[in-house]
Amino acid sequence: MTNYTSRYSEKIEQLENEVKEKQEEIELTNNQSTIDILEEDIYNTKQSIEELKKYV
């Protein structure tokens, strides 16, 4: 079971890094449609993180 927990933890860390990158990208762009897409991606990624945390 520890192996799965480790994998979940690694995936959570990866997703958290993706969120940070997308947040930085939002700060660098002025294009509203790009911002909207990134914000939706961030929301969905955070939902995935919350689901994965249930297994850690």
Where are these regions (language model features)?
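N-terminal acidic leader/helix
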Residues: 1-32, 51-55
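A short hydrophobic/aromatic micro-motif that marks alpha-helical segments and, especially, helix-coil
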Residues: 31, 45-46
